[in-house]
Every structure is written in C-alpha cells, then in structure tokens.
Amino acid sequence: MSEGSSAINASAPAIVVRDLDFAYSHKQLTVLDKVNLQINHLDSICLVGPNGGGKTTLLKLILGLLTPQRGELRVLGHPPADVRLRLGYVPQYAYYDPLCPVTVLDVVLMGRLGMQPLGWYRAADRRAARKALAQMKMEHLAARRFADISGGQRQRVLIARALASDAEILLLDEPTANIDIQSEQSLFALLKELNRTRTIVVVTHDIGFASSFFQRVACVNRQVATHPVAELNGQMIQELYGGEVSMIRHDHNCAGQHCRPGENRGV
C-alpha cells in the first residue's frame, strides 16, 4: 500500500455480515433477510443472483451508503461509514456530461477527494493518480477527454480512480457489462493481479466470468449462500434464478485462439 494507507490486520476478516436485514421503507419489502457473510483479506468473491435479489443493495450496505434495520456489518473491523476512504468502488456506469472537458487524469484524481484538508490536490495526490494510471496502462491517455475514450478504457480509468484512493477492498458493480470480449479478457488478467494485494468483491450476472476468476461465489436472493466456485453447477444456478439456466465456463487461456473440444465446457 502507498503513502497514507492504514496497516491491514490480516488476522481479522475484511468484511463480516451477521444476521443482517434490510428493507426499503418506501417499498415495504424485505430485500435482504438474515444475511450472513464473511469475506477474508485477499479473497476474491462475486455476488450473483436474479434482478431484485439484493446484490447491489448488499454492495451499497458494505459501502456504507445504506444502513441495515437489523444485524451487524463490519468492514475492516469498523462500521462501513468509518472506512469509506479505504474502499474503492467501481460503478457499472459512469454518468458524465459529454460536453464537459474533464480529462482522464481529472477522473482519477477524484479518487483522492477527502484526503486533502483544504480541498486542493497536492503533489502527492497527482503522483498517486499517475501511478494508478500506470498500473492500468492508461498513463498515455492522461490528457485525453474522458468522453472520447472507449468503454473498456473507461472501465480501466474508473478502476484507476479506485486505486488512487489506495483502497484495501475493491468493489465492482457489473464490470463486464458493456465491454467487448477482448476488454473482458484484459479485465480478467487485471483483477488477478490486483487480487495479490487487495480484496476483490464483484457483482455480476456473468456466471461464466465468475467461474473463471473467483475463489468463491455468493448466491444472493434475499438470503446469501456461499460456495467454492469449483462446486458451482447448473442445478444451483437453476434454483437461484428459478428457471432453467445453461452455465458456460469461460477459459481465458483460450482467448484469441481456437480451443480444442472440451476445453470450454458448458455445465
């Protein structure tokens, strides 16, 4: 971790959820019911499940953007709101005005907001932003307008923004949505590298992507059940989604080349 980060207590879990209930008051509908989940440091885990099952809600609870009605939630040993600056969030969509001349470097510098006492970016902030861009191999685009780069490049820039905050936990919402297969393969390699030093939590509908990268999968549909990815099968997915599902395992080792029969199997 770079300057300004707190030491990680590797003996304590990164995220602990115990008997958590959450309901949106305006809907009067329980979204999450008696949820229990533990995510350890340097885990890579994905949250999968049907629309409305509570995946994004659980992510927002971990980020401290929502408060549960019941139960306990600790992130890095603290209430989520107390450690927001130690969490890096990559949204599914980046809303921006295409007429706004904000540059790639400007976007990454936003990851340093809240770290300066007077609100001005320091030299250390600019160094951290450029280092994050270099990690993403995006430093050559620093001066380009964010609106002018491709979807896959924007995804990398948003991850760089999260890295610029020196985040200990990265939370990504549907990172493979709206990007092509080459960008997905690049993202796969990138997440594997980042997982060497950071805990990775991803919301995804792409079960194949989950099967190729993550150590564990958390099936979310009001309640949460976790499984090692190796144990995930079509029957589990069918029960989770409530219908017939075909599960295709991705093989990123076959990217850009023809795979022999059996190397990329459906389950």
Feature roles, as predicted:
Residues 2-34, 38-46, 97, 119:
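A short, flexible loop at the N-terminus of ABC-type nucleotide-binding domains that lies
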Residues 48-50:
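The feature captures the beta-strand-to-loop junction immediately N-terminal to the Walker
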Residues 71-83:
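Conserved ABC transporter NBD signature motif
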Residues 20, 109, 123-141:
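Conserved ABC ATPase "signature" region
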Residues 170-174:
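Catalytic Walker B motif of ABC-type/P-loop ATPase nucleotide-binding domains
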Residues 233-267:
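ABC ATPase nucleotide-binding domains
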Residues 63:
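Helix-to-loop junction immediately C-terminal to a conserved catalytic motif
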